[in-house]
Amino acid sequence: MASSSDLADILAVRGLVAGYGGRPVASGIGMTLKPGDILGLLGANGSGKSTLLKAITGQIRLEGGSVTIDGVDLAGAPERAKVGFGLAIDPPDLPAALTGRQYLQLVASIRGCVEDDWPGVDIAGRLGLRRWIERPIAEYSLGTRAKIAIAAALLGAPPLLIFDESLNGLDPLAAFEVKRIIRALALSGRHAASISTHVVEAVPGLCTRAVLLADGRIARDWDARQLAEANRTPGAFEADVMRALEAQAAEA
């Protein structure tokens, strides 16, 4: 049986530089995600998290470096690369005039699957979306919009799942269900996930790796062993993150 280090990368980011108007916001970032990885992406506002995710998902151009998604180079074949990930952001920017079902159909048509092609589970049912699915998204609360965005991200079970603060607006039951689904997909050995969050204390219990961004660079990272150890002591991980942020601020 192959070790995790022998598995092909689902996401490979090498020397990434990205920003706006020629001004780099994220610089020199390198990381890989393999099947089974769940990455917690941390950082204060303005640390470069959103810029990094926009660059990885092709929403802004790379100014340097490379991004490969499930073996496909983002710059060389952007449309093929984008089929390899599902993205849910907060707040979700969704077409308000469409019903939930129409939006899922739209995403499914882009991804080449059907509107309820979820990974072995009824996501709409699990997230309590069935009573909303035929109603216009304009009528949805922020929490329900987050749910439909997550359901769309999971359509077709793409290899890479990216959640940008999208778990924050969920009610406790929906958040529990989404985390359970993410864990199951990772354990299947065919998927990896990146979860950007400000809820630092939730990371050790969900993620197998974590990265802290500061000033557009990786300031600290944690592996599975370190997260498991931190998870055994309440508050240990939060304290570690705070120390890393303070050290970074002292160097600035």
Model-derived segments and their meaning:
Residues 42-44:
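The feature captures the beta-strand-to-loop junction immediately N-terminal to the Walker
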Residues 161-165:
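Catalytic Walker B motif of ABC-type/P-loop ATPase nucleotide-binding domains
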Residues 65-73, 81, 222:
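Conserved ABC transporter NBD signature motif
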